[in-house]
């Protein structure tokens, strides 16, 4: 059996949201003998679990990023010139089982309510073996996977349904490989569309017609919202493990191109925006900001500029931010900006000139000036910033700010951002400084969110090990951030019975007009999940969406807000 076939059998699905193994790894452990070798069936099962639950944070080659290095043995040079050694063999099977089962204070969730005792033991043995190196994936293989289900000539010339598309939500159904298109006005599911496994994000074309949905198995689906019943019109597999996608938004290039970035192989693919026909594959392997070669520099996040024909492509392990000029694909120009490791997610400031991204292993936020094509600032923050897209608002004292939460600390960090408005000149002294750290009710935050028409700031904490904290969201009045306006237990508001697994409240998302906030209640695969819709002014429940077809809803992407980068 060839390596590609072995890989595809073992890695048909990919990583979800497990997070950093932190303090538990710092504890000393006696060297342990290698675990018994796995059988072929055990290895295939373990490989599947690893890609579903672990690879997103620890890497395909297990070299670590947000999560720790999980190689059997590793060494590294310390600043004083000495050598430190570690690895999963040194930790030993018993210690590894405890970490996997119970999680850590550093942000890794417990898996004893997801995996059986035997599966936990299997994974402890699996990560003590040397990881396999998966195969590459070329332009030819990408093109061979490409399918146009509805040609452009056969698609509608105008919107054929009567839905308010601006307030439609594309909702990830993590464990079923689907997205639900939910009407934001009526709260009805208008369509459930088969996509790649564990969709990471949905992104909108500049026109608002197309939704680009990237699954963690590398499958990119293009959904046409103008059809009477919105459906997939084209798809392509861009790699074995992927996270990011965006489109061309600059004037004259609207909807012309799409770009998707992979975790494995480490590369990005440029495609036709209306058909997904692959045009170019570009590898991201190269040197880190420390001057060392890295074999697995994954594409973390991608955003599209409206001020230039450019994509901002963030390379996780190298700490390099790429400005990819798509005005001439054949003669591609790429500006490489050094920042810090390991780059993850981020978003635009209010002016859409500056892009801010978390370098979460360095506990920093990197800010890029896309007008000059240079790094604007590196800002030190608390442990493991995780902004999602972040949140923009006007602070009563410091003017325009951008907010990020943290996986590793119980704060929401506010950073002053520049503004060309004459009235904001008085805030220039604060630019690129942390001006306030708002006290959160716990670490483990993934997303913060607000809206231009709202007075509130919302934040979740789904990765916190405490049930009460993980099942709740916190709301602050942006005019007074000294204390929370309200802590909302989403699990209780859902009206669903308590389950053995923690039901994690995740990803607050505003309606197009800013009057509602939708929060996912993410339960186990066999448990009933829900989306709880809140009135943003009264903070009371307006609707609980609990359709049986809606299994493990996670990210929710409002069409208008996503189309216009409103957050």
PLM features: what roles do these ranges have?
Residues 30-36, 40, 51, 109-175:
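Flexible coil segments in periplasmic/lumen-exposed cytochrome c-class electron-transfer proteins
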Residues 223-228, 271-279, 325-329, 370-374, ...:
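Short loop/turn segments immediately following beta-strands, especially the blade-tip
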Residues 36-47, 59, 63-101, 190:
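Gly/Gly-Pro-rich "capping" loops immediately C-terminal to redox-active cysteine motifs
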Residues 233, 237-317, 330-338, 343:
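Asp-box/WD-like beta-propeller blade repeats and closely related beta-sheet repeat scaffolds
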Residues 146-163, 203-206, 245-254, 294-307, ...:
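Structural signature of eukaryotic scaffold interfaces centered on beta-propeller domains
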């Amino acid at each position: 059996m060839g390596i590609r076939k072995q890989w595809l059998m073992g890695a048909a699905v990919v990583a979800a949201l497990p997070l950093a193994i932190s303090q538990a790894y710092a504890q000393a452990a006696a060297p342990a003998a290698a675990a018994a070798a796995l059988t072929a069936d055990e290895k295939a099962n373990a490989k599947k679990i690893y890609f579903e639950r672990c690879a997103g944070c620890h890497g395909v080659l297990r070299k670590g990023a947000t999560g720790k290095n999980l190689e059997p043995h590793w060494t590294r040079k310390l600043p004083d010139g000495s050598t430190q050694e570690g690895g999963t063999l040194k930790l030993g099977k018993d210690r590894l089982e405890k970490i996997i089962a119970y999680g850590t204070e550093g942000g890794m969730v417990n898996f004893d309510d997801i995996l059986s005792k035997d599966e936990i033991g299997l994974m402890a043995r699996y990560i003590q073996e040397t990881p396999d190196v998966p195969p590459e994936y070329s332009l030819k293989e990408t093109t061979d996977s490409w399918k146009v289900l509805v040609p452009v000539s056969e698609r509608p010339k105008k919107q054929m349904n009567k839905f308010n598309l601006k307030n439609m939500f594309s909702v990830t159904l993590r464990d079923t490989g689907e997205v639900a298109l939910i009407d934001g006005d009526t709260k009805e599911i208008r369509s459930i569309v088969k996509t790649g496994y564990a969709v990471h994000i949905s992104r909108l074309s500049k026109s608002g017609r197309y939704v680009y949905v990237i699954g963690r198995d590398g499958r990119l689906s293009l959904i046409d919202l103008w059809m009477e019943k919105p459906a997939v019109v084209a798809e392509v597999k861009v790699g074995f493990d992927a996270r990011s996608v965006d489109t061309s938004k600059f004037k004259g290039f609207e909807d012309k191109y799409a770009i998707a970035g992979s975790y494995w192989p480490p590369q990005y693919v440029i495609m036709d925006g209306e058909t997904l026909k692959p045009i170019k594959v570009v590898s991201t392997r190269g040197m880190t900001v420390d001057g060392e070669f890295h074999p697995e520099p994954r594409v973390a996040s991608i955003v599209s500029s409206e001020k230039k024909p450019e994509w901002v492509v963030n390379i996780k392990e190298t700490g390099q931010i790429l400005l990819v000029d798509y005005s001439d694909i054949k003669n591609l120009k790429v500006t490489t900006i050094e920042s810090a490791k390991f780059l993850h997610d981020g978003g635009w400031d209010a002016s859409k000139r500056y892009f801010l991204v978390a370098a979460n292993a360095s506990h920093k936020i990197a800010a890029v000036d896309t007008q000059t094509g240079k790094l604007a600032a590196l800002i030190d923050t608390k442990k493991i910033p995780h902004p999602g897209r972040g949140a923009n608002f006007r602070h009563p004292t410091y003017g325009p700010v951008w907010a990020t939460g943290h996986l590793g600390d119980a704060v929401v960090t506010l950073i002053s951002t520049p503004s060309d408005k004459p009235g904001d000149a008085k805030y220039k002294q604060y630019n690129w400084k942390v001006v306030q750290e708002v006290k959160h009710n716990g670490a483990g935050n993934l997303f913060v969110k607000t809206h231009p028409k709202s007075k509130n700031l919302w934040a979740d904490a789904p990765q916190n090990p405490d049930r009460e904290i993980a099942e709740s969201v916190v709301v602050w009045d942006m005019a007074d951030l000294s204390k929370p306006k309200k802590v909302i237990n989403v699990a209780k508001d859902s009206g669903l019975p308590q389950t053995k697994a923690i039901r994690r409240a995740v990803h607050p998302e505003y309606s197009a007009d800013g009057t509602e906030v939708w929060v996912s209640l993410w339960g186990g695969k066999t448990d009933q999940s829900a989306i709880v819709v809140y009135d943003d002014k009264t903070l009371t429940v307006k609707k609980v969406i609990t359709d049986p077809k809606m299994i493990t809803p996670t990210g929710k992407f409002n069409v208008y807000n996503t189309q216009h980068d409103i957050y």
